[in-house]
């Protein structure tokens, strides 16, 4: 029998080797599932299938995992390295998979009772031939059990979409230690494995796709929708039937029309696109999401928004991580022919930019979103509302988050978890367009021709990054911060609600920044922009890159960030090898200079701003020490403590105030270790041989501190100034400063940044109850700021503020 079985397997191996692509999930099971390959492994498959076993073996060999065809040899006993839980459609009949498996498990368990060092790892594995969830009106897909003919067809049709899913290993040592005397333990192990397979199947395929019209009919019968239709008919003096047709038209505009075949085409197309544009996509912490999916959570992906391709990239990554691509909230501006129809088939549902005052639309959209949650579909939306033109996170728009919390409040049975996602690129497709818009050009309307023109002229754009941040399970978060949420009625909008929406939205942004991906472009751009001439010698640039890397490794911002491991020379060579970066190499008698072209300076600020929050605190410390030359450490700590609340609000930083002092101590220790500063008892001073590196570090805070001083100086001159006027004058002076001193950062005179700073001043007690500025507190901040800003900039700000105040006095006379 074994000879025939081996012949059969060898016969299967040849066609499967080219029909079926290796798609293991996760990509590195040894690391992600913490498998110990020094200990025996037993693979558990759900059904008897030699085809599945051959595909498993192919993947195991490519991953460096033990060969399932070879037996485990333990203390003189020979036991199989794989088992099947149930019978399948098979050519070679067995004595009964269930009994054989229980017997194998029993033998392994007995070995554990006699060998204290043994720990066999039981790894459930399923082979997914295609990932179609089926449709509500067409019954269940044949995912569970395929006969020989069906599997042949599956190998031909779905071979490139076959995934081998490895689950978390079960430790037999743990089972024996916990349940050693249980005679039925060998029977319990298969049952536990079956539970894994059931969860795997749901997390990989998701719920069945809806019958769109049936969903519309259900939504149109919802009491809230019926009331909105009635109000629409009454308010616009039309019949209820006409109002109902209008409601159905709106639903048709909103709703996705997901099609699995279309998703498969998208996978091929996007795979080609990433290979054309980028050198690879780095994905981190996807295990968090897989864990949530296996635990049955309703998952809401909330990525930062850099580019239109964010939609596509995240769905592509999730599909290849063994997860269901989500329903994506896309702006109505993307609903143009033919892209809108294509995106809709890939899971996009469309949302208008504003629907304030349109009760029928808002009700239908809210109920549609609630229905997606109720049916168990994962959802994705961009909380910033639009793409960031500056590379910084934008202030969150809370409408979608409000609807998400309403779904929880109205009795959503499954736990809802928000998954913040950091999406980063070494080159953003639209960055040239962003630069034009920031210089005042009108926003170009999206169309198919524009998209194709952008893609056609771009290639060799470096790497892309998708990093899944720390999830926020809403019920857990609300229990901790808003415990009263459970005591309110479902249909009410209680007092805690708006505060909770704002708090969760901000926490999402904080967690996105905690998952930042540092790359060669970020670091190189930060260093070059720190030089006033946007040029450095190659040696100085490499030294600065190494300093950044060492800091990020030794004083990590968070456990979630991605830090490049390549040496500085490789990072720089990588950036120089990319297209359209605007970095030139020039040679003189002293060696090579690396220079950033002037017209690319604004573009490079985009990439610097992606990681500015990671480097802002050491930049502040460096700036304080540099401008004082020698200063007491306690004064440095006090200065940082005064400025940190404003940095925290502006840059969505996560460090709580009570942990700040310890963090600054670590920063000082690292700067001292790098010999950038001297530390003599309680005195910090500059180390002159390394002063250039310290100057480049300090430049990372230069523009932020200048902005703060502009607003503080205006308030000191006119403590009773209105908030609107304060924002306007701050912006005007910043624009003047940027022209006079060649400041290229587009966010330098962004009104929203000044608005955030002014709101933070209010939150931190810099205004009295009458709305007037507290001059004494502001003067204390001004003293800090004036000491870390050059005399030239100080004089320009002072002169501009005095001129603005004089003009106001003339206008008021």
From Swiss-Prot:
Family statement drawn from the similarity comment of this UniProt entry: Belongs to the GPAT/DAPAT family.
Signal peptide: none
Entry-linked Pfam families: Acyltransferase, GPAT_C
Alphabetical UniProt keywords: Acyltransferase, Cell inner membrane, Cell membrane, Lipid biosynthesis, Lipid metabolism, Membrane, Phospholipid biosynthesis, Phospholipid metabolism, Transferase
GO biological process: CDP-diacylglycerol biosynthetic process; fatty acid metabolic process
Provenance organism: Actinobacillus succinogenes (strain ATCC 55618 / DSM 22257 / CCUG 43843 / 130Z)
Name of protein: Glycerol-3-phosphate acyltransferase
Enzyme class: transferase
Matching PANTHER family: DIHYDROXYACETONE PHOSPHATE ACYLTRANSFERASE (PTHR12563:SF17), GLYCEROL-3-PHOSPHATE ACYLTRANSFERASE (PTHR12563)
NCBIfam families: plsB (TIGR03703), PRK04974.1 (NF003441)
GO molecular function: glycerol-3-phosphate O-acyltransferase activity
